């Protein structure tokens, strides 16, 4: 028993036999913590269980958790490939007790697993405990029979774990193995502890305290256990190798890389094979869990991982996209343990292929510039920070990629100068922003918010309300009143008007009082909770301190509500049809239509669009209630509500749920559950109808779907029906047959165009205009020179190729004159004459007569063009003269 898959199974089976629930790995995108970039430890999915927020139907658990450390605090990216154990993706095996067993059983279970199940040599094992954790030290002596010198007390934070400044915390005990004196290094706590001889492979965390505030801890009434074992490290130990990259799983991936590049994974480029193998795992699992390459957040980290691997593929000589060809090997090795890899295999492959294709242009350009800039630098020197910043800012070449490219040559980067250049750019942007007047306006809103307080929003329950005017703004400054005919910004104590946010547009309506009538043309939110109404006074005066009645445009609000609820249904339908990688990237909810931007690497096909539309309408027709609850944010996320990464949520959030669906386990579940501050319909049936009206690209890896609901959808479909009837009338067929008839007509047109093109080509090769000789000899070389009309440039090239074949040895010059009088020119030289004649030089001689500039191509075939087709014969004469002079 030493294969990675077998080790994983042995661990989970062992703890299952000891009463632990085997819990599947949670996704790499944390469900219960929108502030965490990636899942980076086994305990992440149990965070709310440890804190008491969430209850589970079990008190013991075991997992094999997929983890990524490649961004923020936990970032191993730069070291990957150059050390024996650094990874961006790794698996953490862990067992957990939620107030059930504690230190005695935790240590006993760990000891029996490593010595009896895994069969490790007891004489090579040693442990660390926290400096004053006498209980753990006593238990290790009792259970393992360790002498005092093999129980090392550590007083640093390495052996005391805490979740944050507050919350559960406790001492740790780490298990080490002595890999032998042939490796440099000393035991933990010694000056040589960073060496490879003593390898830590399992950390046991004893959560026995709660930290109320820094320095103030109290005992937990029910202590818990959290452990983490690196699967890759344990595999290396059991397989008797000193590097994780020499284990069976990594050898399979590295061998697949070697097969693609056609060279063995040895020598100076070993690190490149390791980088590709590691990054392939990270990239594939991230895509499978819904992350796609982008320019911010998780998508940016994924892009960095992908591009670093792709640069190393280029170093190994790969000239075409290669990463996607490795995916089947990864799926074969890990797909049984992680079925999501199997389900997402085609998505992973396509994402890698597209990203590598795009990146090659950036890579080639950036490396060319980097080579030129570092040609005179030697080992130990630094590339200037200004140059590194130019590569980043102008050519899209990230700093870490520049550093990685120079690492093998021992050249560094002046990162301080890079940061200074970055800060100068930011300062310039801030100055430009301040100069635009926006900074002064923002200062106004901060001061106003401080003085009048937050606006109370009543719009979830009401569309009319009374409020007191607390501030008026006109031309960027506060005023006491707005007169009839004036426009400005209105702040009131409370309002039913929704302020634009979360993609939903602001409400419109009216403001009224005795002798006052004003229109609200838009509503926005400033600083999160200050509602600002754009008003135009039509009659009377609007003054600070005045009591007013505010009335929302009901019909417009109803249309917005329908579109917003439809957005939620479409979001979940997209996830179910396309996959779990779908995540919201932006939205717009208006009375007329909705648009929803989401992560997806390629265009949706017609069947996918139809399936999404059908699913959303099926849930709509259930006419189920749309339920809104106020919940603590942790409770909301623990229930499965979708939150946006990076979004700042308050302590209390609105959770909007709608529809029913059948889950994969056959149980009924809520179709859509999202954190949302917008306005929604009361029942899904009020949406009326959802029709998708468009799908397209927004950015790399981001698609946009557009749809209409209710009356807007009905009007759209009626107009589409009228257009279809008009087209069918022109085609003289029933509407149901219009598409087939149109397709047949288009194919007929294409056939006729092909036939016409062929006829023109044959006519052109069959003879020229007046005064042209089909073939003549110039300077001992056969020259075929012709001018033709109505032949496109691509056909001129094929004519030149055909002419070269007819001549066997010679030069072909053809001018094609278009109907608008412009001309194209092609010159071909047979291979036996390219040492004497250059087609590029000949074509340039002719293009001058056509009014063109230059021309380009190869010695055997070149092309040019010009605006003066009337000079076709002059161009041919110039080519003949150039040929004679050559």
Curated annotation (Swiss-Prot):
What CDD domains does UniProt report for this protein, alphabetically?
A: AlaRS_core
| GO biological process terms held by the UniProt record | alanyl-tRNA aminoacylation; negative regulation of DNA-templated transcription
Cofactor(s), by name:
Zn(2+)
Name the catalysed reactions. tRNA(Ala) + L-alanine + ATP = L-alanyl-tRNA(Ala) + AMP + diphosphate
- Gene Ontology terms for molecular function: alanine-tRNA ligase activity; aminoacyl-tRNA deacylase activity; ATP binding; tRNA binding; zinc ion binding
Which cell locations does it reside in?
Cytoplasm
Q: Present the record's domain note.
A: Consists of three domains; the N-terminal catalytic domain, the editing domain and the C-terminal C-Ala domain. The editing domain removes incorrectly charged amino acids, while the C-Ala domain, along with tRNA(Ala), serves as a bridge to cooperatively bring together the editing and aminoacylation centers thus stimulating deacylation of misacylated tRNAs.
Free-text comment on the cofactor: Binds 1 zinc ion per subunit.
Q: Where does Zn(2+) bind?
A: 564, 568, 676, 680
Q: What is the name listed in the Swiss-Prot or TrEMBL entry for this protein?
A: Alanine--tRNA ligase
Q: Which InterPro entries match?
A: aa-tRNA-synth_II/BPL/LPL (IPR045864), Ala-tRNA-lgiase_IIc (IPR002318), Ala-tRNA-ligase_IIc_anticod-bd (IPR018162), Ala-tRNA-synth_IIc_core (IPR018165), Ala-tRNA-synth_IIc_N (IPR018164), Ala-tRNA_ligase (IPR050058), Ala_tRNA_ligase_euk/bac (IPR023033), DHHA1_dom (IPR003156)
State the organism's lineage.
Bacteria, Pseudomonadati, Pseudomonadota, Alphaproteobacteria, Hyphomicrobiales
Please provide one cellular component term from the Gene Ontology annotations of this protein.
Answer: cytosol
Family that this chain belongs to: Belongs to the class-II aminoacyl-tRNA synthetase family.
The EC number(s) attached to this protein equal 6.1.1.7
Q: What UniProt keywords apply to this chain's record, in alphabetical order?
A: Aminoacyl-tRNA synthetase, ATP-binding, Cytoplasm, Ligase, Metal-binding, Nucleotide-binding, Protein biosynthesis, RNA-binding, tRNA-binding, Zinc
PANTHER family the record matches = ALANINE--TRNA LIGASE, CYTOPLASMIC, ALANYL-TRNA SYNTHETASE
> What is the recorded function of this protein according to its Swiss-Prot or TrEMBL entry?
Catalyzes the attachment of alanine to tRNA(Ala) in a two-step reaction: alanine is first activated by ATP to form Ala-AMP and then transferred to the acceptor end of tRNA(Ala). Also edits incorrectly charged Ser-tRNA(Ala) and Gly-tRNA(Ala) via its editing domain.
Q: List the disulfide bonds.
A: none
Q: Which organism is it from?
A: Methylobacterium sp. (strain 4-46)
């Amino acid at each position: 028993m030493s294969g990675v898959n077998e080790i994983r199974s042995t661990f989970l089976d062992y703890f299952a036999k000891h009463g632990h629930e085997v819990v599947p790995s949670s996704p790499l995108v944390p469900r219960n913590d929108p502030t965490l970039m990636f899942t980076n430890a086994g305990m992440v999915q149990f965070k709310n269980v440890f804190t008491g927020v969430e209850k589970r139907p079990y008190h013991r658990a075991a997992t094999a958790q997929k983890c990524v450390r490649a961004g923020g605090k936990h970032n191993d990216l730069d070291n990957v490939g150059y050390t024996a154990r650094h990874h961006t993706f790794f698996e953490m095996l862990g067992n957990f007790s939620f107030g059930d067993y504690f230190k005695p059983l935790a240590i006993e279970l760990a000891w029996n697993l490593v010595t009896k199940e895994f069969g490790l040599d007891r004489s090579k094992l040693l442990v660390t405990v926290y400096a004053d954790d006498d209980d753990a030290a006593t238990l290790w002596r009792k259970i393992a029979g360790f002498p005092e010198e093999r129980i090392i007390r550590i007083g640093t934070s390495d052996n005391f774990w805490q979740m944050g400044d507050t919350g559960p915390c406790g001492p740790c005990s780490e298990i080490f193995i002595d890999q032998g004196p042939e490796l440099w290094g000393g035991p933990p706590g010694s000056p040589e502890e960073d060496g490879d001889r003593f390898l830590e492979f399992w950390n046991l965390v004893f959560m026995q305290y709660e930290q109320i505030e820094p320095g103030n801890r109290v005992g937990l009434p029910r202590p818990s256990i959290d452990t983490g074992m690196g699967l890759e490290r344990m595999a290396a130990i059991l397989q008797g190798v000193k590097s994780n990259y020499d284990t069976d799983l990594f050898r399979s991936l590295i061998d697949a890389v070697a097969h693609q590049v056609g060279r063995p994974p040895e020598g100076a480029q070993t690190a490149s094979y390791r980088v590709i193998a590691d990054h392939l795992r990270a990239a594939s699992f991230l895509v499978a869990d819904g992350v796609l390459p982008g320019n911010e957040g998780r998508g940016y980290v994924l892009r960095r991982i992908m591009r670093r691997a792709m640069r190393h593929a280029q170093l190994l000589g790969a000239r075409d996209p290669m990463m996607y060809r490795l995916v089947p090997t990864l799926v074969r090795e890990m797909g049984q343990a992680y079925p999501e890899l199997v389900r997402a295999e085609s998505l992973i492959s396509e994402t890698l292929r597209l990203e590598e294709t795009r990146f090659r242009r950036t890579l080639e350009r950036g490396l060319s510039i980097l080579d030129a800039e570092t040609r005179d630098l030697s080992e130990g020197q630094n590339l200037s920070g200004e140059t590194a910043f130019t590569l980043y800012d102008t050519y899209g070449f990230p700093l870490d990629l520049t550093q990685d490219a120079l690492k093998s040559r021992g050249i560094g980067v002046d990162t301080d100068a890079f940061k200074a250049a970055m800060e100068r750019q930011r300062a310039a942007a801030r100055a430009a922003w301040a100069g635009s007047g926006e900074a002064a306006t923002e200062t106004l809103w901060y001061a106003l918010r401080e003085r009048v307080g937050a606006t109370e929003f009543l719009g979830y329950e009401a569309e009319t309300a009374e409020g007191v005017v607390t501030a008026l703004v006109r031309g960027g400054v506060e005023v006491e009143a707005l007169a009839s005919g004036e426009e400005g910004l209105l702040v009131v104590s409370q309002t039913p008007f929704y302020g634009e946010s979360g993609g939903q547009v602001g409400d419109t309506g009216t403001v009224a009082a005795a002798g006052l009538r004003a229109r609200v043309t838009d509503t926005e939110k400033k600083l999160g909770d200050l509602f600002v109404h754009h008003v135009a006074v039509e009659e009377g005066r609007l003054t600070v301190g005045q009591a007013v009645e505010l009335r929302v445009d009901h019909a417009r609000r109803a249309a917005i509500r329908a579109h917003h609820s439809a957005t939620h249904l479409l979001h979940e339908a997209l996830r179910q049809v396309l996959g779990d990688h779908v995540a919201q990237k932006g939205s717009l909810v208006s009375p007329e239509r909705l648009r929803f931007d989401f992560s997806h690497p390629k265009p949706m096909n017609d069947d996918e669009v139809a399936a999404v539309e059908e699913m959303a309408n099926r849930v709509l027709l259930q006419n189920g209630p749309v339920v809104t609850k106020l919940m603590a944010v942790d409770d909301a996320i623990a229930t499965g509500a979708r939150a946006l990464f990076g979004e700042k949520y308050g302590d209390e959030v609105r959770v909007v749920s709608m529809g029913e669906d059948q889950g994969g386990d056959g149980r009924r579940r809520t179709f859509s559950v999202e954190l949302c501050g917008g306005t929604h319909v009361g029942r899904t049936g009020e949406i009326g109808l959802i029709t998708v009206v468009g799908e397209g690209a927004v950015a790399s890896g981001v698609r946009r779907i557009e749809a209409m609901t209710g009356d807007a959808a009905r009007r759209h479909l009626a107009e589409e029906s009228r257009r279809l009837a008009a087209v069918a009338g022109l085609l003289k067929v029933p509407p149901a047959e219009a598409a087939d008839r149109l397709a047949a007509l288009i194919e007929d047109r294409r056939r006729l165009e092909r036939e016409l093109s062929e006829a023109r080509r044959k006519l052109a090769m069959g003879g020229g205009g007046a005064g042209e000789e089909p073939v003549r000899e110039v300077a001992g070389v056969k020259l075929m020179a012709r001018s033709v009309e109505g032949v496109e440039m691509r056909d001129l090239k094929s004519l030149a190729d055909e002419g070269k074949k007819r001549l066997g040895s010679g030069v072909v010059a053809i001018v094609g004159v278009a109907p608008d009088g412009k001309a194209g020119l092609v010159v071909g030289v047979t291979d036996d004459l390219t040492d004497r004649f250059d087609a590029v030089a000949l074509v340039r001689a002719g293009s001058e007569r056509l009014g063109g500039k230059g021309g380009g191509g190869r010695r055997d075939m070149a092309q040019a063009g010009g605006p003066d087709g009337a000079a076709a014969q002059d161009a041919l004469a110039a080519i003949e003269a150039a040929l004679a002079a050559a």
